[in-house]
Amino acid sequence: MNQKIFLCSICNINSGTCNEDCKFCSQSVRYKADIDRYKQKEISLILKEAQDAYSNGALGFCLVTSDKGLNDKTLNFVCSIAEVLSKELPELRLIACNGTATIEQLLTLRASGIKAYNHNLETSREFYPKICTTHSWDERYETCQNINNAGLVLISGGIFGLGEREEDRVSMLKSLDSLKPTSVPINFYHHNEALELSPNPLSVDEALSLIKLTRAMIPDAQRIMVAGGRELMFGDRESEIFANGANSIVIGNYLTTSGKAMQRDLEMLKSLNLDVASSVK
């Protein structure tokens, strides 16, 4: 039986408005990166992106905002989008990724049609102060606990290649395993010249070993998803991610960087004799 690959697409419903100082993120207003910046994307455009993603095999669609966490205005905006998408595309699993959130806020999202919430730990508790000083790692962990307690599907992972040590990688993965996420997104840092952070880049072999390590250390996760940085990190060795434990990818564009055309990803999977998942377990 062929391995089935779960496809997900993400939509930046507001962009580049965050006041936090995460050193790896071009969406912070502090770094003045050359990216699109807008407060709210039109719902008609979001619906079109969701329809395109679903028609290309995506079962997950993530609504991403660029602030530290949910406030009333953002919560209402995400809920209004979810209500439209739930009606138009009932088979599409709606995911929210809106930063720190209380249980009450998460329950409101759930009532609007959101099924899952993505909040990454990013790195280890020990290393986090070196990449962000405006909020704590503990706040991130608490939000993940809130997601579980609100009855939403937890999606939580991190980003490799920030200059972290091997011990930090192991520490983060242990913390993630304690939260029992359904899906673990793995991102690989892509340097933007506007950002302060400029560590030595990972090798392809090192990145593949990190996918394998993630699968080994979080054995109960249904999906290990290779997300941001996939094309740039792996190049013509991209197909090797699946043999090393990945069974999910993000298709289409990322938040502030371009991905491959969706059709090219589908062609890659077909060439590897890998089927696209047709249902959410």
UniProtKB/Swiss-Prot annotation:
NCBIfam families the record matches: bioB (TIGR00433), PRK08508.1 (NF006308)
Residues the record lists as binding [4Fe-4S] cluster: C18, C22, C25
Chain ranges of the Radical SAM core domain: 1-230
Domain of life: Bacteria
Protein role: Catalyzes the conversion of dethiobiotin (DTB) to biotin by the insertion of a sulfur atom into dethiobiotin via a radical-based mechanism.
Organism: Sulfurimonas denitrificans (strain ATCC 33889 / DSM 1251) (Thiomicrospira denitrificans (strain ATCC 33889 / DSM 1251))
Coiled coil segments of this chain: none
CDD domains: Radical_SAM
InterPro entries: Aldolase_TIM, BATS_dom, Biotin_synth/BioAB, Biotin_synthase, Elp3/MiaA/NifB-like_rSAM, rSAM
Lineage: Bacteria, Pseudomonadati, Campylobacterota, Epsilonproteobacteria, Campylobacterales
GO biological process: biotin biosynthetic process
Free-text comment on the cofactor: Binds 1 [4Fe-4S] cluster. The cluster is coordinated with 3 cysteines and an exchangeable S-adenosyl-L-methionine.
Entry EC number(s): 2.8.1.6
GO MF term set: 2 iron, 2 sulfur cluster binding; 4 iron, 4 sulfur cluster binding; biotin synthase activity; iron ion binding
Family: Belongs to the radical SAM superfamily. Biotin synthase family.
Quaternary organization: Homodimer.
S-adenosyl-L-methionine as UniProt keyword: yes
Protein's recorded name: Biotin synthase
Chain sites annotated for binding [2Fe-2S] cluster: C62, C97, R223
Keywords assigned: 2Fe-2S, 4Fe-4S, Biotin biosynthesis, Iron, Iron-sulfur, Metal-binding, S-adenosyl-L-methionine, Transferase
Cofactor(s) listed: [4Fe-4S] cluster; [2Fe-2S] cluster
EC top class named in words: transferase
Protein's pathway: Cofactor biosynthesis; biotin biosynthesis; biotin from 7,8-diaminononanoate: step 2/2
Catalytic activity: (4R,5S)-dethiobiotin + (sulfur carrier)-SH + 2 reduced [2Fe-2S]-[ferredoxin] + 2 S-adenosyl-L-methionine = (sulfur carrier)-H + biotin + 2 5'-deoxyadenosine + 2 L-methionine + 2 oxidized [2Fe-2S]-[ferredoxin]
